[in-house]
Amino acid sequence: MIDSFDEFCLWMYVMVDDIWQQISPLFQRPGPAAACSDSELLTMALVGECRGWAEETVLLSNWRERRDLFPCVPSQSRFNRRRRALMTAFNLIRQTVLRLLDLSADGQCAIDSLPVPVVKFHLVPGSTGDWATHGADFGKVASKKLTIFGFKLHLLVSLGGLILDFVLAPASAADLTVGAEMLAEHTDLTVFGDKGYISVDLAGQLLRHNRLKLLTLPRRNQHCQLPPELSHTF
């Protein structure tokens, strides 16, 4: 039984460190070990997410007041850089912890993407190439009928609002392509998606191999339409 915030932090650290020891060989980086270990940094990020500390300035400010739990709190620039470098590991650990907490057992989810523009369209020709180096490019956002330069954040979210998985992809990457890769890592779910995820082949593969049912809102010209009570889910 976890009765306090301190106990929750300890439990989270033990879980994160156990998982990290198993997967850390996949994320080796050059240089000396940091004063704040990767396990500590990942734990601070996960606990901060649980507490709703959405901004890094708020998260780090709170941890600086709790140096009894984490004595070495990195600067914001260093924390941000290391957190981005560990993004894949963070997501793997996050999914494992969610399963341990049994918070993701709803079984019904929604998949969608949202645009993350990084440079205004008309300013792209004169901008530096830094964003392009990190994967940003041009892509269309059909729902808003616009073109952006940047990324799309693809999310798998429980109907209760819990983020189960995410992928930050170039703006040009199709929802169906990224969604297929993301859903292939999950099983035993019913997933609702918009028209961007329509694919009979993908739906069949996920059902056969992952026991995952992908339900999409049909296009108006499709013969098979959803019943009204199910359409309201979208």
Give the ranges of each region predicted by the language model.
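Short alpha-helical elements
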Residues: 1-234
